[in-house]
């Protein structure tokens, strides 16, 4: 394992490994989405209670981002990653054998918290890549992460239909074991760059939030965009179970394939960060999401309308996430994990908020309410960008 040096470049094999593991680990947070209707029926709970599984998973991820990712500046990242993978595997097994929904909530919270591993990789790509390749390499890791998010829905949709929702989480546990072995074999040791205690480290995170307006801006507008995207996925299984579709989890998985092509565009978008700038990409991304939700509202009773909406909302999110996350890390390269913690914690709070609001909207107003929530969140992101010059 070659020792990494700041701004000196990363081997392609390590970059590829990080992208693959990023996709496989973040997938833990999204396996449940196509399976919500199956879980609801199996456990005899309401749609709102089933939707809370997705909500607590996102909250868990946000907690992991807030309290675990900063440790990458203090302790061995390799060791933290290995521990997280081990706990994630155990929690996936807990979910698979749970007979009560509250156990699923608790295990999902911890599974989400331990699935933050990709957020150790993005700072590595940003910190150790050559300056000319930073955006491209971060985009490459992001494409792996986004492909994992979307492919996880495809896989879980089909596995749920063919084998059952519990079997999907057993498979997830096995995947974590494989990732753990890969990490031990390929991931190099990276020296910590913070001298002090964990308490002091966390204080420095809050100091960065209070003192750096740009990082706050980058994080907040991306968070609203992520909330907009999560709105469509958190209620898609419920929508497809109704007229005129009457479809199961396998169709949710099939629609997930539509977003994969868009996710692969993230590596290409990385090149545009330097050319177009963060603000322009943020404007384009929010506008794409507004078009997506208009399409979902007007043509949401057709598969073609849903496909177009899914593709546009995903590409719009990528424009915002890649540009703003890159901006955060480059703003404070000496504290890359802490800057990324601020960005991604805010980001997933936005995702949890979007998921929760969409669930309430679905309960009271159906698909029209979900579209309204998604459009409002995208519009807020757009307004923030219009009002700011950064």
For each feature predicted by the language model, list its residue ranges.
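Juxtamembrane intracellular "pre-TM" segments in multi-pass secondary transporters
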Residues: 2-9, 188-220
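Conserved MFS/SLC helix-loop-helix module at the cytosolic interface between two early adjacent transmembrane helices
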Residues: 63-101
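Helix-to-loop junctions at the C-terminal end of transmembrane segments
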Residues: 65-76, 264-278, 362
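Structural signature of the two symmetry-related core transmembrane helices
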Residues: 79-93, 280-295, 375
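Helix-loop-helix hairpin linking two adjacent transmembrane segments in secondary transporters
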Residues: 103, 140-187
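Cytoplasmic helix-loop-helix junction between adjacent transmembrane helices
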Residues: 107-143
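Intracellular juxtamembrane helix-capping segments at the cytosolic ends
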Residues: 117-129, 319-332
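C-terminal transmembrane helical hairpin of 12-TM major facilitator-type secondary transporters
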Residues: 279-324
């Amino acid at each position: 394992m070659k020792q990494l040096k700041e701004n000196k470049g990363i081997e392609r094999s390590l970059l590829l490994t990080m992208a693959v593991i990023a996709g496989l680990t973040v997938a833990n947070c999204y396996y449940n989405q196509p399976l919500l209707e199956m879980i609801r029926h199996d456990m005899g709970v309401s749609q709102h209670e089933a939707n809370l599984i997705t909500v607590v998973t996102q909250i868990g991820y946000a907690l992991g981002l807030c309290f675990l990712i900063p440790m990458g500046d203090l302790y061995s990242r390799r060791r933290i990653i290995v521990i997280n993978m081990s706990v994630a595997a155990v929690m996936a097994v807990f979910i698979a054998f749970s007979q009560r929904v509250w156990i699923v909530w608790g295990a999902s919270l911890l599974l989400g918290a331990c699935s933050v591993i990709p957020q150790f990789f993005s700072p590595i790509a940003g910190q150790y890549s050559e300056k000319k390749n930073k955006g491209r390499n971060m985009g490459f890791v992001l494409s792996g992460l986004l492909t994992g998010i979307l492919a996880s829905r495809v896989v879980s949709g089909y596995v749920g239909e063919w084998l059952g929702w519990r079997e999907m989480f057993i498979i997830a546990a096995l995947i974590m074991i494989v990732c753990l072995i890969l990490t031990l074999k390929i991931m190099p040791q990276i020296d910590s760059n913070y001298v002090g205690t964990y308490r002091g480290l966390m204080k420095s995170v809050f100091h960065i939030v209070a003192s750096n307006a740009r990082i706050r801006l980058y994080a907040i507008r991306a968070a609203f965009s992520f909330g907009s995207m999560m709105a469509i996925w958190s209620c898609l299984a419920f929508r497809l179970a109704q007229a005129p579709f009457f479809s199961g989890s396998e169709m949710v998985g099939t629609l997930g394939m539509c977003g994969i092509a868009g996710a692969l565009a993230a590596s290409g978008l990385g090149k545009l960060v330097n050319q177009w700038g963060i603000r322009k990409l943020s404007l384009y991304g929010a506008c794409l999401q507004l078009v997506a939700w208009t399409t979902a509202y007007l043509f949401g009773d057709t598969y073609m309308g849903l496909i177009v909406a899914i593709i546009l909302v995903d590409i719009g999110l990528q424009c915002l996430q890649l540009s703003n996350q890159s901006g955060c890390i480059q703003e404070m390269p000496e504290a890359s994990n802490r800057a990324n913690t601020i960005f991604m914690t805010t980001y997933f709070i936005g995702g949890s908020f979007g998921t929760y609001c969409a669930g309430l909207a679905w309960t009271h107003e159906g698909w029209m309410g979900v579209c309204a929530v998604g459009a409002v969140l995208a519009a807020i992101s757009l307004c923030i960008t219009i009002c700011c010059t950064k």
